[in-house]
Each structure stands twice: as structure tokens, then as C-alpha cells.
């Protein structure tokens, strides 16, 4: 079988790149004849994953010669980012349907879709999909309300088998730009880090440079102003580099969903920063300490983080 994979790939987003790698490995193990991934950086994707790749607007020839289109994972079918984004990912699906190809939806979070047109187009496409797996109950409930069957699955990154090195004395901090990550939040977070980890090495982990770098550099500067000097910012952010860096930590304080997953899988003591319901749910499922962006005091959750493991 020849497969085309459509996702948010080539943008150096750690979670989406990890899912693309897991999916391509799965397809190879099942004997796929050819895998082509649609990417914003086809050359890099091809080199990193050992597959064929085509540009975001040059997918049609690959779809025409394929047997199956796989759309996912991630949150592709939503218009919270933009209506244009939803239309693009639907256009890929509709192209496959028009040319008589099988369509599978892989481990996606569906919605929110606010526009009536977006809902109609998404519903029409998904009713024609061969198989749909979703990563959360909310997505499954939405599809159920549309009378579309789906299977609930765990996020693919949870399937990774990771080394558990956990070097003592190293703390990883992963932040992203977000409306609640303001000076007040960063100062409170820095105070707790200085209080608990002044004697440890601090590594700041920007997992998507275009979004994470500015706040990462700002937080590093705040820590230096508070007297913490053993700080570095991870420069290499390839999939392997990030996994190795997180696996090597004693502690991890992280916002991004997939950073928290890697911490969990690598056996790192992890504190989650809640900016998205999926992070809150993950923390609840794995009993992680959790701080909210608007919490007045972080001390109780940091106490939980520093408790010895049973």
C-alpha cells in the first residue's frame, strides 16, 4: 500500500514531529510500499524520517498515486487557529476522496469548529472516512453528535519506549508563549525555582523555536537576575535531541502536552503547567503536580514535585 500522511509537519513542533515519526515507523513495520509525508520542509522531513515528502501545496500528485491518505495526528480539524487552516486540511482530505482514495483519521483532536460552513464540510468529509481514531472524549462526543463512529485512543507519543537516565542535579523548564505567561507568572515561577533548585543545573527547553524562544530567553534572564547562573538553553531541538535532553533530567517543569508525556515516559519527576485542558487531564491521569497560570501560590505543587518517589 502507498500512503500519504497529512499533518502539521515540518514546522519544528516537537509533538507533531514525534507523531509523524511514530506513524511512519508503524506503517513501515506493516509493510508499506511507499510513505509520502506532506511537509512545510520536505527535504528535512525526508532526511529525518526516511520517507518521501512533498510540499504543503504540492500534494496532489502524491495523493493521485497513493492508496490511502492518513490525516493526523494533532488538532488539524478545528478553526480556533484559523478558518484557513481548517480549509487546508479538509482540502487534502477532499482531494483524496475525489480521486477515490481511502481516508483514515489518525489520533486527532477534532474541534472546536465554530463556523457553520466548517462544521458542514468537516462532517461531510468524516462521514466518508474509512477509519477514525480520536485522542479525547470531547472529540468522540462531537463525532457521536454527528452520528459518526470513532475509536478513542491514547496519544501516540505515549507509545514511545524511552531511556530512564534521570541524572541527578538537572532541572528542565519548558515554556511557551501564551497569554497568561506574563511577568507576574514568570517571577513567581522563578522564585520557586530559585528556592528549590538553586544548587542544580537548569536547562530551558524551547520545543518550537518560533513560539518558545522569546519566553525561554526572558525566563533565563529573570533567573540570572535572581542569582542563578548555571543555566543553558537547549539549542538543538530535533526529536532525538529533545528526547535525550528530557530523559536525562531529574526534574521537569513543562507547559507543552508532549513535553509532559516525554517526562512521564522517561520517569522524570514532572510538574505540569496548565494552559490547555489536555494538559490538565494528563496531569490528573498520571497524578502530576499541576500549577495554573493564574494561581497565586505555587509552593504546594512544588512541594509535591520534590517529594521522594515511592
Task: Show the residue positions of the predicted features.
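Active-site anion-handling motifs in enzyme catalytic cores
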Residues: 1-310
Amino acid at each position: 500500500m502507498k500512503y500519504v500522511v497529512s499533518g502539521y509537519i515540518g514546522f519544528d513542533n516537537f509533538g507533531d514531529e514525534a507523531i509523524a515519526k511514530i506513524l511512519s515507523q508503524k506503517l513501515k513495520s506493516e509493510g508499506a510500499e511507499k510513505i509520502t509525508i506532506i511537509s512545510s520542509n520536505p527535504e528535512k522531513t525526508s532526511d529525518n524520517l526516511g520517507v518521501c515528502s512533498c510540499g504543503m501545496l504540492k500534494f496532489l500528485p502524491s495523493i493521485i498515486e497513493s492508496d490511502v491518505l492518513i490525516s493526523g495526528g494533532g488538532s488539524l480539524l478545528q478553526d480556533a487557529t484559523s478558518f484557513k487552516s481548517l480549509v487546508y486540511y479538509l482540502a487534502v482530505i477532499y482531494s483524496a476522496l475525489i480521486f477515490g482514495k481511502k481516508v483514515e483519521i489518525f489520533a486527532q483532536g477534532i474541534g472546536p469548529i465554530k463556523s457553520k460552513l466548517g462544521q458542514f464540510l468537516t462532517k461531510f468529509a468524516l462521514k466518508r472516512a474509512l477509519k477514525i481514531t480520536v485522542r479525547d472524549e470531547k472529540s468522540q462526543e462531537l463525532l457521536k453528535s454527528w452520528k459518526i463512529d470513532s475509536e478513542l485512543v491514547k496519544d501516540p507519543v505515549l507509545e514511545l519506549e524511552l531511556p530512564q537516565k534521570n541524572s541527578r542535579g538537572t532541572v528542565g523548564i519548558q515554556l511557551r508563549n501564551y497569554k497568561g505567561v506574563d511577568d507576574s507568572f514568570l517571577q513567581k515561577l522563578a522564585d520557586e525555582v530559585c528556592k528549590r533548585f538553586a544548587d542544580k543545573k537548569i536547562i530551558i527547553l524551547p520545543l518550537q523555536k518560533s513560539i518558545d524562544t522569546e519566553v525561554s530567553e526572558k525566563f533565563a534572564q529573570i533567573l540570572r537576575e535572581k542569582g542563578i547562573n548555571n543555566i543553558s538553553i537547549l539549542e538543538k531541538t530535533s526529536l532525538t535531541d529533545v528526547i535525550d535532553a528530557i530523559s536525562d533530567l531529574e526534574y521537569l517543569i513543562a507547559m507543552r502536552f508532549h513535553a509532559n508525556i516525554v517526562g512521564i515516559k522517561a520517569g522524570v519527576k514532572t510538574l505540569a503547567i496548565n494552559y490547555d485542558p489536555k494538559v490538565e487531564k494528563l496531569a490528573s491521569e498520571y497524578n502530576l503536580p499541576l500549577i495554573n497560570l493564574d494561581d497565586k501560590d505555587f509552593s504546594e505543587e512544588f512541594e509535591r514535585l520534590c517529594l521522594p518517589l515511592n
